[in-house]
Each structure stands twice: as structure tokens, then as C-alpha cells.
Amino acid sequence: FGGLLYFAKDFKNLTKNEVQNKISNYQSLAKIPMLMAVDEEGGTVSRISSNKNLVADPFLSPSELYQKGGLEAIKEDTIKKTNILSELGLNLNLAPVVDITLNKEDYMYERSLQEDAQITSEYAQTVIRTSDPTKLSFTLKHFPGYGNNADTHQGISIDTRDLNTIKQQDLKPFIAG
């Protein structure tokens, strides 16, 4: 059992047919169907929708979608992502980001919904309930929640918050989803 994680460079300048063939060729080599993953969050993390050959307009960030049309816009976006990614042969989206962060200075702010635990929980539920798991699975990120911590791509981050704070805020969207 295994899989591949694709990044924007893996789709650069490719057409829909080229991506489908590439993924299909990898799958044909596996004895067991592989996970074919991408993190298409929208906004600053847009691996697929950064390629105009694959998606006409890049996917918006969660906060942009929510501000534009609330949970209905989230539903429409989830359906669109599910259809586009699954048509390409991908079966796992490492999204949505359900970290709770309300401070513009926080590392995860631009990638998050930028709302409280209750609304972020509703967001997580909406994505999971709207998705079609026979086409595409989603992963809620970043368990147990980044909070206001530093970028772990740049080094080690230590969360000094107490467990009760994490339970009351950060874990709620993961439980809801």
C-alpha cells in the first residue's frame, strides 16, 4: 500500500489528459490502488488550480469563500474540487485547513477560515458532508490544531497552551468533521 503526493510543479503546464495519463500510469503499476494526494486548499495553497489548463480560476481561500457566500459557497467549492480532482485521478485532498486562528500575525491565518471554533466546526462538517467519498476523500488539517504557533516548515514549534484550551477550541473542528 502506498501513494504519491503531488505538488504544483507536478502539474505545471500539463493538460487534463496529460495529468490523467500520468496518474493512470502510476496506478497501473500498483498491485493495490494507491492514494493519489494533493493539498488543494485554495488561496495560497493551490497545487492544481494554479494551472489554467486544469482550472480556469484558482480556488479561493476558505476565508474568501466564507465571506463571499457563507457555508453555501463552501458547499459549491467542495463539489467543484471533488469533481475536478477526481476527474484527474486524484483520490485524496489534504484539505481543508480547520486550524483556529484569528490573529493576522499567525502563520496559519491566511490558510484558515479565520473564524471561531463553532463556525470552523460548521465549516469542517460542511466539507465532509458535502464531499463524495467514492470520488475524493478529504483530510482535516492540522491536527490537533496549529493555533498561533510558528511555521513548522521552518523549525520546531512548541505549543504552550494548556490542554483545556486546546480541547475547547482546536479539537472542536476535528471532532465535528
Predicted regions and their residues:
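Phosphate/pyrophosphate-binding betaalpha-module
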Residues: T130-H142, T165, K172-G177
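Conserved hydrophobic/aromatic pocket- or pore-lining residues that grip, position, or stack substrates
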Residues: L85, V127, K141, G145, ...
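Enzymes and membrane/adaptor proteins characterized by extended Gly/Ser/Thr/Asp/Glu-rich
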Residues: G3-I119, G147-R161
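A general structural detector for well-ordered alpha-helical segments in enzyme core domains, enriched
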Residues: K22, Y26, K81, Y123, ...
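Short, contiguous, pocket-lining structural segments
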Residues: S112, I119, Y123, I166-Q169
